[in-house]
Amino acid sequence: MTYSLNTLNSDAAHHATRGLARYAQELGLLFGLIGLVFWGLALASYNLTDPAWTTSGNGSPTRNWGGGIGAFLADGSYALLGLSVWLCWAAGMRSWMAALARWMRGGVPEAGEPSPRLRRLSFWSGLVLLVVAGTALEWSRLYRLEGLLPGNAGGALGYVVGPFAQKWLGFNGAGLLCIALMVPVSYTHLTLPTNRE
């Protein structure tokens, strides 16, 4: 008589996701990966001469690897958040990998893992703080990169938050606060280490 792996060690209170919910989870993982790869390719191949949201282009063919849709997506992303949009892309990849790990475990939470509500709240609040601090820092320190972007360095969010921080904290104070927010927030809120041995 044979048993599948971990059958005798399974907890009766936690059952793996089955049926339609499992199928929806798999489709979500597949479409999430496709979307993240497309967004990453569109951002990586951004060109200022492509016709998009902030520009009509110069009449040449679209050079973005995502075509016209990719040009619009990359242009809008860079216009809104500047180069800090890559923080959102990296957080999206990390979130996708965490969802993949949950799917591979069958949807059964590990012992010591925080509740889904706490995990989501911590992740999203950390990401918002990280992006706000990143765009403000980009606006105040990396303004030489404006020639590569469709708008201001730090995008529209950096254009709003950066001057506010610099007005109230000064040039050095705003930079120190943004760095002080970015380093611990990116570690504590976006990683959430679990009790693994």
Feature roles, as predicted:
Residues 1-190:
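Alpha-helical transmembrane segments used as membrane anchors
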Residues 189, 195-197:
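Single conserved hydrophobic/aromatic residue that forms the stacking wall/gate
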